[in-house]
């Protein structure tokens, strides 16, 4: 929170540079934000892995049947089987998750897709999320997890989905 108060919103937009000639560069993809020099835009190297694929696998955790948001670390994050970080041109498809806290986090990545995902078992904290990334596609995610309702913890909902 301090960063946003003292520095302001931080925007990162990941791009591939095609040709470079002197002080002129060309991006392979369109720019997603207006570039205004008063905001101090800068170009940085971006160390990353490319063309990483995760497919045709099932991850099984041990999320409990009485999930409570922010109860403790076990409820919010004990069963996060995979995180896609600093990846480009990468994908996840035909993957199943059972009783997990969070299926997948896509962070600091570009041109990543996650699709044809199934989430079952006990409810957890999150399904699939993207944070600080550019051009991420998340689609065809079926979440049928079971767990207590947010506003009535005494009622267990079949197929409630992640929190």
Model-found features: residue ranges?
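Extracellular/periplasmic carbohydrate-active domains that bind, remodel
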Residues: 1-163
């Amino acid at each position: 929170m301090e960063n946003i108060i003292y520095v302001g919103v931080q925007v990162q937009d990941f791009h591939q540079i095609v040709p470079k000639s002197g002080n002129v560069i060309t991006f392979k993809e369109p720019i997603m934000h207006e570039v205004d020099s008063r905001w101090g835009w800068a170009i940085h190297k971006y160390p990353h892995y490319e063309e990483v694929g995760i497919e045709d696998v099932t991850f099984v955790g041990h999320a409990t049947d009485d999930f409570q948001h922010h109860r403790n670390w076990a409820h919010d994050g004990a069963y996060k089987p995979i995180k896609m970080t600093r990846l480009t041109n990468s994908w996840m498809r035909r993957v199943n998750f059972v009783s997990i806290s969070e299926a997948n986090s896509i962070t600091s990545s570009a041109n990543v897709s996650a699709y044809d995902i199934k989430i079952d078992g006990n409810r957890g904290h999150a399904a699939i999320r993207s944070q600080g990334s550019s051009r991420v596609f998340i689609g065809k995610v079926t979440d049928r997890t079971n767990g207590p309702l947010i506003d009535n913890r005494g009622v267990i909902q079949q197929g409630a989905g992640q929190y």
